[in-house]
Amino acid sequence: MAGVIMAQSLTHDAMTLPADWRDLLALTKPRVMSLVVFTALCGLLAAPGDVHPVLGFSSILAIALGAGASGALNQWYEAGLDARMKRTAGRPLPAGRLDPQTALQFGIGLAAFSLFLMLFASNWQATVLLAGSILFYVVIYTMWLKPRTPQNIVIGGAAGAFPPLIGWVAATGSIAPLPVLLFLLIFLWTPPHFWALALFVRSDYAAAGIPMMPVVAGEKSTRRQILFYALIMAAAAIAPWPLGYTGALYGWTAILLSAIFVLLSVQVGIRTTAEDDRMQPEKRLFAFSIAYLFILFGAVVADHWWPL
């Protein structure tokens, strides 16, 4: 409830302002949404069988809208926390450009429409998974895990791991081993990705009172855990090839990219920081982790359509 109360305190200026489409778009976290959409699309394209282009597009649009709804409801609930962090203070709600009621209505409306569209375009199984991912991100991660435990990213990573599974189920109506492995890959990728970010914005999280791992356990422990998760993530990334679910194109891509990821994680894991440190290794790992997922999921599709 603290997030809601703080969000309501921001309305004194914003209540008089009309909603701008750019602010509504910002609520959906477009950069995060782009990765969600891409991994969902890869899950759909890697699935067996043919999907009608219109229904396939509608399913991916539904996933995008669901991700946008999750982002909007997250920002509505965390407006007060965002106002205390330099990185997020310019967002529409803490900056006073949008009132919380509009953000809440927008998020709920977007979520409802995304579920209706998914049900119309694909099947009830994909719709249930999409609803579960929205609820998990908003309720389990945002409202419960994030303000309470440094394991918020570890457990909450499941929310961001749903898209390829939803894309696959939208195309087939059933779950198979490959999308489950892709779910596991994103789940294990999430801690080193976000903890690399948390290391170089640690002061922001500390100021907002968010118990991220570097704030609670310290930098040394966080660095060790980044390396640990990078190693098991690499194993999960490579696993589809020896298990027979992908071919050599994906396999060699996964080996090369995972080796780079682990090397960057080693650089982060073994170092100590000084007061004036610019955190360049951490920033390199964070940036590469995004490219890693884009390229690896692209390789899943390429391997499916053009196997070696």
UniProtKB/Swiss-Prot annotation:
Membrane topology category: Multi-pass membrane protein
GO-annotated molecular function: protoheme IX farnesyltransferase activity
Pathway recorded for this protein: Porphyrin-containing compound metabolism; heme O biosynthesis; heme O from protoheme: step 1/1
Enzyme class (EC, first level): transferase
Signal sequence, renumbered to the chain: none
Biological-process GO terms, alphabetical: heme O biosynthetic process
The EC number(s) this enzyme carries: 2.5.1.141
Record keywords: Cell inner membrane, Cell membrane, Heme biosynthesis, Membrane, Transferase, Transmembrane, Transmembrane helix
UniProt-listed Gene3D superfamilies: UbiA prenyltransferase
Subcellular location: Cell inner membrane
Regions that span the bilayer: 32-52, 53-73, 102-122, 125-145, 153-173, 180-200, 226-246, 250-270, 285-305
GO annotation, cellular component aspect: plasma membrane
Functional description taken from the UniProt entry: Converts heme B (protoheme IX) to heme O by substitution of the vinyl group on carbon 2 of heme B porphyrin ring with a hydroxyethyl farnesyl side group.
Annotated family: Belongs to the UbiA prenyltransferase family. Protoheme IX farnesyltransferase subfamily.
Any further remark recorded for this protein: Carbon 2 of the heme B porphyrin ring is defined according to the Fischer nomenclature.
PANTHER family xref list: 4-HYDROXYBENZOATE SOLANESYLTRANSFERASE (PTHR43448:SF7), PROTOHEME IX FARNESYLTRANSFERASE, MITOCHONDRIAL (PTHR43448)
Protein name: Protoheme IX farnesyltransferase
Protein species of origin: Sphingopyxis alaskensis (strain DSM 13593 / LMG 18877 / RB2256) (Sphingomonas alaskensis)
